Protein backbone atom coordinates (compact mmCIF):
# COMPACT_ATOMS: atom_id res chain seq x y z
CA UNK A 1 0.00 0.00 0.00
CA UNK A 2 2.90 2.31 0.73
CA UNK A 3 6.14 2.66 -1.16
CA UNK A 4 9.46 4.29 -0.43
CA UNK A 5 10.74 6.62 -3.11
CA UNK A 6 14.47 6.80 -3.69
CA UNK A 7 15.90 10.16 -4.70
CA UNK A 8 18.06 9.04 -7.59
CA UNK A 9 18.74 12.33 -9.34
CA UNK A 10 20.24 15.61 -8.27
CA UNK A 11 17.28 17.29 -9.96
CA UNK A 12 14.91 15.99 -7.30
CA UNK A 13 17.18 17.33 -4.59
CA UNK A 14 17.55 20.70 -6.29
CA UNK A 15 13.78 21.04 -6.70
CA UNK A 16 13.20 20.21 -3.04
CA UNK A 17 15.89 22.59 -1.82
CA UNK A 18 14.52 25.29 -4.11
CA UNK A 19 11.16 24.88 -2.37
CA UNK A 20 12.98 25.04 0.96
CA UNK A 21 14.59 28.27 -0.17
CA UNK A 22 11.21 29.75 -1.09
CA UNK A 23 9.91 28.84 2.35
CA UNK A 24 12.94 30.42 3.96
CA UNK A 25 12.43 33.61 1.96
CA UNK A 26 8.79 33.68 3.01
CA UNK A 27 9.88 33.83 6.64
CA UNK A 28 10.84 37.44 6.12
CA UNK A 29 7.28 38.56 5.36
CA UNK A 30 5.70 36.80 8.35
CA UNK A 31 5.00 38.74 11.56
CA UNK A 32 7.57 38.39 14.27
CA UNK A 33 6.68 36.11 17.16
CA UNK A 34 8.46 35.25 20.37
CA UNK A 35 10.31 31.97 20.19
CA UNK A 36 8.43 29.66 22.56
CA UNK A 37 10.39 26.77 23.99
CA UNK A 38 9.53 23.31 22.74
CA UNK A 39 8.44 22.28 26.21
CA UNK A 40 5.96 25.14 26.49
CA UNK A 41 4.65 24.49 23.00
CA UNK A 42 4.34 20.77 23.66
CA UNK A 43 2.53 21.21 26.97
CA UNK A 44 0.12 23.69 25.45
CA UNK A 45 -1.09 21.57 22.56
CA UNK A 46 -0.36 17.89 23.00
CA UNK A 47 -2.96 16.96 25.60
CA UNK A 48 -5.81 18.46 23.59
CA UNK A 49 -4.58 17.09 20.27
CA UNK A 50 -4.15 13.56 21.52
CA UNK A 51 -7.48 13.51 23.30
CA UNK A 52 -9.25 14.44 20.06
CA UNK A 53 -7.37 12.07 17.80
CA UNK A 54 -7.13 9.05 20.08
CA UNK A 55 -10.41 9.25 22.01
CA UNK A 56 -12.55 6.13 21.81
CA UNK A 57 -10.12 4.47 19.40
CA UNK A 58 -11.25 1.01 18.35
CA UNK A 59 -8.80 -1.92 18.18
CA UNK A 60 -6.87 -1.70 14.92
CA UNK A 61 -7.31 -4.22 12.14
CA UNK A 62 -4.20 -5.90 10.75
CA UNK A 63 -4.14 -3.70 7.64
CA UNK A 64 -4.41 -0.57 9.76
CA UNK A 65 -1.55 -1.75 11.95
CA UNK A 66 0.57 -2.40 8.86
CA UNK A 67 -0.19 1.08 7.57
CA UNK A 68 0.65 2.63 10.92
CA UNK A 69 3.95 0.73 11.00
CA UNK A 70 4.86 1.96 7.50
CA UNK A 71 4.03 5.55 8.43
CA UNK A 72 5.99 5.28 11.67
CA UNK A 73 9.03 4.19 9.68
CA UNK A 74 8.68 7.15 7.33
CA UNK A 75 8.29 9.70 10.12
CA UNK A 76 11.24 8.30 12.08
CA UNK A 77 13.27 8.62 8.88
CA UNK A 78 12.26 12.28 8.76
CA UNK A 79 13.44 13.11 12.25
CA UNK A 80 16.58 10.97 11.90
CA UNK A 81 17.86 12.71 8.79
CA UNK A 82 16.85 16.21 9.89
CA UNK A 83 18.75 15.56 13.12
CA UNK A 84 21.77 14.57 11.04
CA UNK A 85 21.57 17.86 9.16
CA UNK A 86 21.58 19.67 12.50
CA UNK A 87 24.50 17.68 13.87
CA UNK A 88 26.60 18.17 10.76
CA UNK A 89 25.75 21.88 10.61
CA UNK A 90 27.18 22.42 14.07
CA UNK A 91 30.12 20.21 13.09
CA UNK A 92 30.57 22.28 9.89
CA UNK A 93 30.76 19.14 7.78
CA UNK A 94 29.46 20.21 4.38
CA UNK A 95 29.86 16.80 2.75
CA UNK A 96 27.81 15.13 5.47
CA UNK A 97 25.17 17.87 5.30
CA UNK A 98 24.78 17.23 1.57
CA UNK A 99 24.22 13.50 2.08
CA UNK A 100 21.79 14.08 4.95
CA UNK A 101 19.77 16.54 2.90
CA UNK A 102 19.58 14.06 0.03
CA UNK A 103 17.99 11.66 2.49
CA UNK A 104 15.62 14.37 3.73
CA UNK A 105 14.49 14.77 0.11
CA UNK A 106 13.98 11.05 -0.42
CA UNK A 107 12.08 10.74 2.84
CA UNK A 108 9.81 13.69 2.03
CA UNK A 109 9.06 12.12 -1.34
CA UNK A 110 8.11 8.87 0.37
CA UNK A 111 5.84 10.54 2.92
CA UNK A 112 4.10 12.50 0.16
CA UNK A 113 3.83 9.41 -2.05
CA UNK A 114 2.14 7.53 0.79
CA UNK A 115 -1.07 9.50 0.30
CA UNK A 116 -1.21 9.14 -3.50
CA UNK A 117 -3.08 5.78 -3.51
CA UNK A 118 -5.86 7.52 -1.59
CA UNK A 119 -5.93 11.08 -2.91
CA UNK A 120 -4.08 11.07 -6.23
CA UNK A 121 -0.94 12.51 -7.79
CA UNK A 122 -1.94 16.14 -7.30
CA UNK A 123 -2.25 15.58 -3.56
CA UNK A 124 1.16 13.92 -3.56
CA UNK A 125 2.70 16.99 -5.18
CA UNK A 126 0.89 19.42 -2.89
CA UNK A 127 1.89 17.51 0.22
CA UNK A 128 5.51 17.36 -0.92
CA UNK A 129 5.57 21.15 -1.24
CA UNK A 130 4.17 21.49 2.28
CA UNK A 131 6.80 19.11 3.62
CA UNK A 132 9.44 21.21 1.88
CA UNK A 133 8.04 24.21 3.71
CA UNK A 134 8.28 22.36 7.00
CA UNK A 135 11.91 21.47 6.41
CA UNK A 136 12.62 24.98 5.16
CA UNK A 137 11.38 26.44 8.42
CA UNK A 138 13.36 23.94 10.50
CA UNK A 139 16.48 24.67 8.44
CA UNK A 140 15.95 28.41 8.87
CA UNK A 141 15.74 27.95 12.63
CA UNK A 142 18.85 25.77 12.56
CA UNK A 143 20.87 28.37 10.66
CA UNK A 144 19.60 31.17 12.90
CA UNK A 145 20.67 29.18 15.95
CA UNK A 146 24.08 28.41 14.46
CA UNK A 147 24.52 32.12 13.76
CA UNK A 148 23.20 33.27 17.15
CA UNK A 149 20.45 35.33 15.49
CA UNK A 150 17.48 35.54 17.88
CA UNK A 151 15.40 37.61 15.47
CA UNK A 152 15.82 35.03 12.72
CA UNK A 153 14.93 32.30 15.22
CA UNK A 154 11.66 34.08 15.95
CA UNK A 155 10.73 34.48 12.30
CA UNK A 156 11.63 30.86 11.58
CA UNK A 157 9.41 29.77 14.47
CA UNK A 158 6.55 31.77 12.99
CA UNK A 159 7.16 30.13 9.62
CA UNK A 160 7.11 26.69 11.24
CA UNK A 161 3.83 27.57 12.95
CA UNK A 162 2.24 28.87 9.73
CA UNK A 163 3.34 25.78 7.83
CA UNK A 164 1.84 23.53 10.53
CA UNK A 165 -1.50 25.25 10.00
CA UNK A 166 -1.22 24.86 6.21
CA UNK A 167 -0.56 21.13 6.56
CA UNK A 168 -3.42 20.79 9.05
CA UNK A 169 -5.80 22.52 6.63
CA UNK A 170 -4.63 20.33 3.76
CA UNK A 171 -5.04 17.06 5.65
CA UNK A 172 -8.34 18.01 7.28
CA UNK A 173 -9.84 18.87 3.90
CA UNK A 174 -8.67 15.55 2.50
CA UNK A 175 -9.86 13.46 5.44
CA UNK A 176 -12.73 14.37 7.79
CA UNK A 177 -11.22 12.11 10.45
CA UNK A 178 -8.19 14.38 10.70
CA UNK A 179 -9.73 17.49 12.29
CA UNK A 180 -7.74 20.64 11.69
CA UNK A 181 -7.24 21.66 15.31
CA UNK A 182 -6.04 18.21 16.34
CA UNK A 183 -3.58 17.93 13.46
CA UNK A 184 -2.40 21.49 14.03
CA UNK A 185 -1.69 20.70 17.67
CA UNK A 186 0.23 17.56 16.79
CA UNK A 187 2.34 19.43 14.24
CA UNK A 188 3.04 22.34 16.59
CA UNK A 189 4.36 19.88 19.14
CA UNK A 190 6.45 18.21 16.43
CA UNK A 191 7.91 21.55 15.42
CA UNK A 192 8.62 22.29 19.06
CA UNK A 193 10.65 19.11 19.31
CA UNK A 194 12.75 20.20 16.31
CA UNK A 195 13.40 23.54 18.00
CA UNK A 196 14.33 22.02 21.33
CA UNK A 197 16.60 19.47 19.69
CA UNK A 198 18.46 22.14 17.73
CA UNK A 199 18.98 24.24 20.84
CA UNK A 200 20.27 21.26 22.81
CA UNK A 201 22.65 20.18 20.06
CA UNK A 202 23.99 23.72 19.80
CA UNK A 203 24.58 23.78 23.57
CA UNK A 204 26.05 20.25 23.54
CA UNK A 205 23.46 19.09 26.06
CA UNK A 206 23.50 15.56 24.73
CA UNK A 207 21.84 13.88 27.71
CA UNK A 208 18.88 16.23 27.41
CA UNK A 209 18.80 15.80 23.64
CA UNK A 210 18.63 12.03 24.07
CA UNK A 211 15.43 12.51 26.07
CA UNK A 212 14.09 14.90 23.43
CA UNK A 213 14.83 12.32 20.73
CA UNK A 214 12.79 9.71 22.60
CA UNK A 215 9.90 12.14 23.07
CA UNK A 216 10.18 13.17 19.42
CA UNK A 217 10.11 9.56 18.23
CA UNK A 218 7.09 8.67 20.36
CA UNK A 219 5.31 11.78 19.14
CA UNK A 220 5.79 11.01 15.44
CA UNK A 221 4.48 7.53 16.21
CA UNK A 222 1.31 9.26 17.41
CA UNK A 223 1.12 11.26 14.19
CA UNK A 224 1.55 8.09 12.13
CA UNK A 225 -1.02 6.15 14.13
CA UNK A 226 -3.58 8.96 13.95
CA UNK A 227 -3.10 9.14 10.18
CA UNK A 228 -3.49 5.39 9.75
CA UNK A 229 -6.64 5.35 11.87
CA UNK A 230 -8.13 8.22 9.86
CA UNK A 231 -7.36 6.51 6.54
CA UNK A 232 -8.95 3.28 7.78
CA UNK A 233 -12.12 5.15 8.72
CA UNK A 234 -12.33 7.04 5.43
CA UNK A 235 -11.41 4.13 3.15
CA UNK A 236 -13.14 1.22 4.82
CA UNK A 237 -13.01 -1.12 1.83
CA UNK A 238 -9.26 -0.64 1.38
CA UNK A 239 -8.66 -1.69 4.97
CA UNK A 240 -11.19 -4.50 5.29
Language-model-detected regions and their locations in the chain:
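Mid-length scaffold segments of soluble, non-membrane domains
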Residues: 121-155
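C-terminal segment of N-terminal export signals and the immediately downstream linker at the start
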Residues: 9, 32-62
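Alpha-helical and His/Cys-centered functional microenvironments
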Residues: 46, 82, 138
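N-terminal secretory signal peptides
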Residues: 1-15, 22-31, 37
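A glycine-rich, hydrophobic loop/mini-helix early in the fold
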Residues: 106-115, 131
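C-terminal amphipathic alpha-helix
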Residues: 50, 54, 60-97, 101-104, ...
Amino acid sequence: MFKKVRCESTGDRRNFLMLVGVAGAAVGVLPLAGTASAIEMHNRVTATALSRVAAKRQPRAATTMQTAAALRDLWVGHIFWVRNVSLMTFDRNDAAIKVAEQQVVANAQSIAAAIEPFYGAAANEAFFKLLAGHYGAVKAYLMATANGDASAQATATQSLTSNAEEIAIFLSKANPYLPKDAVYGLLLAHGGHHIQQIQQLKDRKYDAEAKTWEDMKNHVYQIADATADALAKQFVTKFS
